[in-house]
Amino acid sequence: MTKHIFVTGGVVSSLGKGLTSASIGMVLERRGLRVRMQKLDPYINVDPGTMSPYQHGEVYVLDDGSETDLDLGHYERFTSGKLNRDCNYTTGQIYLSVIEKERRGQFLGKTVQVIPHVTNEIKRVIKRMGGDDVDVVITEIGGTVGDIESLPFLEAIRQFSLDAGRENCLYMHLTLVPYLKAADELKTKPTQHSVGQLREIGIQPDVLVCRCEQSISRDDRDKIALFCNVEPEAVIEEKDKDFSIYEVPLSLVDNKLDELIVKKLGLTSAGSLDMTPWNDLLHRLRNPRHEISIAVVGKYAEHKDAYKSIYESLDHAGMHHDAQIRIGRIQSSDIEREGAERLLSGFHGILVPGGFGERGVEGKVQAIQFARERNVPFFGICLGMQTAVIEYGRNVLGLEKAHSTEFDKDTPHPVICLLDEQQNVIDLGGTMRLGSQPSRLVADSKAIQAYGREEIDERHRHRYEFNNEYRKAFEDAGMRFTGLSPDGGLVEIVEIDSHPWFVAAQFHPEFKSKPLKSHPLFTDFIEAAINRRKQRVTEEIASETEKPTAS
């Protein structure tokens, strides 16, 4: 029988339910259990695909083309499972499914209501995650207890234990125990009230995971347990991690959360826990042999979640090379005002990620020109590849006003144009070229050197592509097209051989990087940045040596 863990959050938002859920999934996998992850989001959008990064953070794309919440990135990075569209549902999807069933007459003339029809649909998508090939399903409920948007989901998971059996369900509530500096004490009252709201709905938490700045004393732990009706050992401390999010699983293990879950759910098939690879990972993170700085030049750089997977992938590659990565978040629009020289000098590598819309595009072009002309390792992703093509067209081929038709429909040199399949598309949501697509790599390229194989599959999210009418001109001018779709029609990777490391990809490699298995393109990019730093140190030493001495 599949066991279910439901993770809710209270007191405030942004407590880290996704990271905690992913950490639990990883630890249970380390005990030999088969785990599936799911996120239920209470917003009415069908998916986050059309939401602003400032509102929602990055959109995380799955192999099947689903545009999902960024928490699914945590799930895939921490656990071994490949997720699909069943792993992320929104209120919009749930209501859409219910309305479509009503239109087909599946409710036989009944009045369609939140209870039972909407809650039944929610229970259906949760139940579908189980099966003979899975031991534990971890379902995270988005939002905060007390929000009106979350009520149907909370009611559904309350009912779910009646259907599946209370012994097969575990309710875990993530809460905040704030520290008041003036009183020099932790306050448990917000947690008590949050749990009280859950109990009013009919859910008694089995485990409380308490986010805190300071350690929770035994007295406070006993107090929380008493007022929230849980056992003292079920009050789990989760202190803030200033060093790395990859400490979270070890913190939960130190608090014996995995043992508690195994005990409460009767997971007799669970084996002993081996966290050796994770401990080794953190050892490398704490003891770097190199320190390099990478500039991420983006449209949404001031919002830390907008490029979440990019930053994590850089850290993965850094750990692979025993390197500490200092990330400079540079607004591309700032480069337009202040210049690339002022903002980018001193970085050992430059990465230009994806984005939509014209704002800041010229700043990206200037950043790429700086990287190309100064021989700074450069990595372009999605729009980063397209702007690399635009920059090369303007400044190397001499194609004045070369641009993408996304930003200038009347450009005399449309080096980037709309995909043929997108010509008649009107709707924005879910209509891009999405999900995993195959590519073939060209021999004697940096791409094939990184991957070590000719055929790859990577995740995409775009409407525009390189215009093949310009392919020969670019090749003659020194830009190589080293990754192509199987039919050769779509450009997937571009490189410049005369540059130490200049690689740009139309796809999103950041969605397939993991802490214990860094993505090969990120791995080689960071290696190039390390070499750049070594070269600069050598040049500085040589310069000092050549200075004349006083007579």
Curated annotation (Swiss-Prot):
Belongs to the CTP synthase family. ATP binds at residues 14-19, 71. It catalyses: UTP + L-glutamine + ATP + H2O = CTP + L-glutamate + ADP + phosphate + 2 H(+); L-glutamine + H2O = L-glutamate + NH4(+); UTP + NH4(+) + ATP = CTP + ADP + phosphate + 2 H(+). Pathway: Pyrimidine metabolism; CTP biosynthesis via de novo pathway; CTP from UDP: step 2/2. It comes from Rhodopirellula baltica (strain DSM 10527 / NCIMB 13988 / SH1). This is CTP synthase. The active site is at residues 382, 508, 510. GO terms for molecular function: ATP binding; CTP synthase activity; glutaminase activity; identical protein binding; metal ion binding. The keyword Ligase applies. Homotetramer. The lineage of its organism: Bacteria, Pseudomonadati, Planctomycetota, Planctomycetia, Pirellulales.
